[in-house]
């Protein structure tokens, strides 16, 4: 099925079916195409073309209608070989800059504000579920560590990393410490570890702190805790989601059971994060030519819960770290628009986090 190259006529009809279905959410018939598009083809000819497309698995007929709707294969052919992504238009660009650019100019204290803002703007503009996955931190460059004493046996450790990223951990202490002790140890850590990546610190912290000033017991505790202090945050803690109200308003989710299934999936932040993360490692076949964008459609997704969804994702950068932006929505998605706004937001987010260095 779908093994040969489609003719120009077949490509035109398939493109019209998908574009019309995206707008109307209604199956598309040959008469509709003949009346609304100047292809120079009769209703009968269009019907024959649609029959060929159906035989090859690009479209199919829902049991309740005489019209046709795209299959996963049809959408795949469309995004790979028919879709033309234009540059973002000026009105939309201004709207995104108004909503997001204000925060970028204010240079907020941490990455959390930036990433959450990006998710909200992307969800609002795309009218889909938007997902921002913060970068993995193995290659993140350590700037400084601050320790805040909460009680004599409890303290908060704050790791500051390049590009506004901050990691916070509360530690229970098996020994009593004073503010002077944590100040001395913090100074030693910052002097000896600043500028290293977190993975370098995990491998060499004991050697690098050997023979340094400061309370030995507290330094030993930091060394023993390096695996958690200087390690990745759990993937679900790296996830920022927005736009649930837009995706549940789509016709595909009118039935209460479908809405419940969707909300259950969204609330499982680990699963959503894994979906977006995996989309970045999928086959080159899922990337339209000349695009740094992955589009995973329906059955191409890694879980049953996402079989009726499309995931469009692209990387963004913060120094030498890589995060991922994604749009999740029904397969009946305006793919050109999704790719356009996703690329623009990725560029904006990269610029903001790069300027923060």
From Swiss-Prot:
A Gene Ontology BP annotation from the UniProt entry: negative regulation of DNA-templated transcription
TM helices/strands, residue ranges: none
GO molecular function, one term: DNA binding
Keyword Lyase part of the UniProt annotation: no
One matching Pfam family: HrcA
Keyword Repressor in annotation: yes
UniProt cross-references to InterPro entries, sorted A to Z: GAF-like_dom_sf, HrcA, HrcA_C, WH-like_DNA-bd_sf, WH_DNA-bd_sf, WHTH_transcript_rep_HrcA_IDD
Keywords: Repressor, Stress response, Transcription, Transcription regulation
Function summary: Negative regulator of class I heat shock genes (grpE-dnaK-dnaJ and groELS operons). Prevents heat-shock induction of these operons.
Alphabetical list of HAMAP family matching this protein: HrcA
Family note: Belongs to the HrcA family.
Protein name, entry field: Heat-inducible transcription repressor HrcA
Organism this protein belongs to: Chlorobium phaeovibrioides (strain DSM 265 / 1930)
Classification of source organism: Bacteria, Pseudomonadati, Chlorobiota, Chlorobiia, Chlorobiales
């Amino acid at each position: 099925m779908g093994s040969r190259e489609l003719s120009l006529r077949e490509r035109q009809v398939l493109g019209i079916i998908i574009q019309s279905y995206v707008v109307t959410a209604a199956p598309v018939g040959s008469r509709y195409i003949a009346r609304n598009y100047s292809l120079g083809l009769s209703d009968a000819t269009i019907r024959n073309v649609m029959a060929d497309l159906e035989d090859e698995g690009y479209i199919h007929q829902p049991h309740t209608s005489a019209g046709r709707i795209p299959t996963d294969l049809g959408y795949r052919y469309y995004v790979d070989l028919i879709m033309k992504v234009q540059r973002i238009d000026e009105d939309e660009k201004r709207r995104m800059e108004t909503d997001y650019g204000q925060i970028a100019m204010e240079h907020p204290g941490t990455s959390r504000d930036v990433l959450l803002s990006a998710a909200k703007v992307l969800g609002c503009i795309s009218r889909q579920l938007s997902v921002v996955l913060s970068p993995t931190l193995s290659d993140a460059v350590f700037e400084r560590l601050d320790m805040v004493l909460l009680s004599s046996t409890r303290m908060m450790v704050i790791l500051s990393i390049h590009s506004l990223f901050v990691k916070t951990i509360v530690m229970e202490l098996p020994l009593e410490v004073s503010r002077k002790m944590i100040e001395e140890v913090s100074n030693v850590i910052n002097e000896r570890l600043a500028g290293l990546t977190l993975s370098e610190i995990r491998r060499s912290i004991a050697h690098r702190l050997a023979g340094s000033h400061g309370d030995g017991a507290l330094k030993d505790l930091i060394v023993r805790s390096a695996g958690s202090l200087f390690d990745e945050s759990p993937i679900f803690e790296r996830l920022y989601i927005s736009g649930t109200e837009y995706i549940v308003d789509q016709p595909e989710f009118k039935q209460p059971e479908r809405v419940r299934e969707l909300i259950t999936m969204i609330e499982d932040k680990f699963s959503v994060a894994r979906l977006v993360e995996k989309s970045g490692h999928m086959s080159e076949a899922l990337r339209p030519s000349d695009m740094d964008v992955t589009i995973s459609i329906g059955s191409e997704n890694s879980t049953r819960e996402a079989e009726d969804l499309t995931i469009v994702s692209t990387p963004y950068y913060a120094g030498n770290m890589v995060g991922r932006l994604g749009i999740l929505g029904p397969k009946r998605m305006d793919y050109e628009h999704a790719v356009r706004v996703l690329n623009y937001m990725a560029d904006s987010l990269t610029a903001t986090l790069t300027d923060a260095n």
